[in-house]
Amino acid sequence: TPVISSAASDVYKRQPIEDDINLIEKIYEYGCRFMQLTYNNQSLLASGCYEKNDGGVTNFGREAIKEMNRLGIVVDMSHSGEKSTYDAIDLSQKPIAITHANPSFWHQTRRSKSDDLLKTLSKSGGMLGLSLYPHHLKDGTNCSLDSFCEMVARLVDVMGIKNIGIGSDLCLNQPDSVVEWMRNGTWTKSKNLGEGSKTNQGFPDQPEWFKDARGFNNIENGLKKVGFDNNDISAILGNNWFNFYKEI
């Protein structure tokens, strides 16, 4: 039976550490094991994927990566720009992760990742968690299970199977005010829609085949349909993440 991945504690933005590197150890003590260097915008650590100019990892970011490596916190570049992500791969002494994103060959968005970047990530021992958030899916809420699983099969040709997992980005029973806060925070007086639109400003509906964690059974069946065996499916649905974190 394929192994289903469990949840891990992740700091979504770097705000909890403000500009104090000593707070990284504090959030580790509270259970954090993954931390993103950015959300969509520029942070004190690196550039987000929505910035016009990607300045790469900053001096503070370099020191933060060293401290995260020391403690055993995974460097997560899901929302970061491409140059910043390459920098993080180069600077980190341990493999990094893109915990929730999809390849741009399947669905082109600012949050999607290029083949070249994903090849570099896999060669460094890093992990990609495939997102099930509708804005990251081809055809959004109407994305088919077949399309998703066919993408996974093609991605194996790019990255190899050991570096691919699931990072569902699933937000259940949350009000739209949560995603509005995530996009706007306190940095703008204008309304920032992020990956949304005027007609779809809140959380989008999940596809029918992944309404909640029970949808992993559908993914298991879909992966079998496109040719994966039980060992491969176990790897993608959990074992790859388990093996990855053992190196951190």
State the predicted function of each range:
Residues 1-8, 12:
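Single conserved hydrophobic/aromatic residue that forms the stacking wall/gate
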Residues 13-14, 40-42, 73, 78-85, ...:
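Active-site beta-loop-alpha junctions enriched in small/polar residues
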Residues 19-33, 50-97, 110-126, 146-162:
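Histidine/acidic residue-rich metal-binding segments in metalloenzymes
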Residues 33-40, 123-130, 164-170:
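Non-cysteine beta-strand/loop elements that form the S-adenosyl-L-methionine
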Residues 44-55, 205-208:
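Glycine-rich phosphate-binding "P-loop"
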Residues 122-142:
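A conserved active-site cap/scaffold subdomain adjacent to cofactor or substrate pockets
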Residues 159-184, 188-193, 197-209:
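Short acidic/histidine-rich active-site segments
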Residues 201-248:
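Mid-to-C-terminal alpha-helical segments outside catalytic/metal-binding sites
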